[in-house]
Amino acid sequence: MAKKNHQGLDANLIAQNKKARHDYTVTDTFEAGLVLTGTEIKSVRARRVTLKDGYAQFHNGELWLMNVHIAEFAGGNIFNHDPLRNRKLLLHKKELKKLQGELTAKGVTLVPLKMYLKHGYAKVLLGLAQGKHEYDKRNAIKKREQDRQIDRVMKHY
């Protein structure tokens, strides 16, 4: 079990993409390792990561994480990393083949949902997702509001 800090939050959670669950319907999730440089892992441990605009894509049979911002390390020197560079994702070959087959469908993409540390290694939770239409988002908001209303009424009984 992950360690909890004094606020009750998961101590190993680095960043979370809350907007992804709102904008996409996530059908499946995969845990992948990241290939990072020294200054990148230091910035990750300092929780200076933004997953908001990120996505994963195949290039030459390898899966790459694109457009994820890992801030430059403050104590870095001229060898500091580029904050938006593409980072290689590490998955088993079987998982890569499965993902490559599923990503061929129209409208399906791979988005990062969470980044966390597991046994000292940076991991990213990827979601196989399909984009929601505007009316899907409105229906989700309407359903959430109805659930809240039911909870309020049931609280008094």
Curated annotation (Swiss-Prot):
Its main location: cytoplasm. One of its GO terms (molecular function) is RNA binding. Keywords: Cytoplasm, RNA-binding. GO terms for biological process: trans-translation. It is found in: Cytoplasm. GO terms for cellular component: cytosol. Signal peptide: none annotated. InterPro entries: SmpB, SsrA-bd_prot, SsrA-bd_prot_CS. Pfam families: SmpB. Required for rescue of stalled ribosomes mediated by trans-translation. Binds to transfer-messenger RNA (tmRNA), required for stable association of tmRNA with ribosomes. tmRNA and SmpB together mimic tRNA shape, replacing the anticodon stem-loop with SmpB. tmRNA is encoded by the ssrA gene; the 2 termini fold to resemble tRNA(Ala) and it encodes a 'tag peptide', a short internal open reading frame. During trans-translation Ala-aminoacylated tmRNA acts like a tRNA, entering the A-site of stalled ribosomes, displacing the stalled mRNA. This is SsrA-binding protein. The gene is smpB.
